[in-house]
Amino acid sequence: FTSADVERLFSLYPIKNSIVSTVANIDAAVVNALNRLSQHFILFDYLTPLPIANCYETPETLGQDRIASAVGAATLCPDKNLLIVDAGSAITYDFVSAEQGYLGGNIAPGIKMRLTVLHQMTKKLPQVEVEQNALTPLFGKNTKEAIAAGVVRGGGFEVKGYMRALSEQGIDFVAFATGGHAPYILNGVKDGMRHEPNLVLIGLNKILEYNMHGA
């Protein structure tokens, strides 16, 4: 992505404001182009003011996508307790309190990572690919099926475990699933989760609006 791409986007669409969030190093020319062409521009980092409280002890180490998805969920369901499950390279579990804001979360290996590690860290288990919408049996009848079922169903059971733990504490909450591998999770959970593929983008837009209006 280059400054020329920025110029082209601004020429094609009526863009007025912009926000950038990335884990990779961003070209200074891209930042300069966005800053020059935008009425309001934010290079999102841990110092950016947020519309919800962030109670994480080390905000500088918190993934920008995680806090953005938390803001996105709070935007869609204000004044609610929220569990956000983001299934990508890793699976993250984040909790937003209706009263206290973002309280933290956990990080676990993603579906693809689990499949790969089973192959790489053992001598005989094969590399297995699983379609996102594939229905896996409860118990596999061959090794490939056992790996697929163990990983995909295990991910679903993991999510259910978090949901059950919150419910057992008497916490009413709304659960969101997001991320590129969310369909794997949704297949295992079936009910009780709201699928929102654009949760991070919704959160980034809210953060941009919040800062535009004098956070």
Kindly give the residue locations of the regions a language model identified.
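Divalent metal-binding pocket/active-site signature
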Residues: V85
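Nucleotide/phosphate-binding catalytic cleft detector across ATP-hydrolyzing
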Residues: F1-L82, E99-A215
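Short beta-strand scaffold segments in enzyme catalytic cores
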Residues: I91-V96
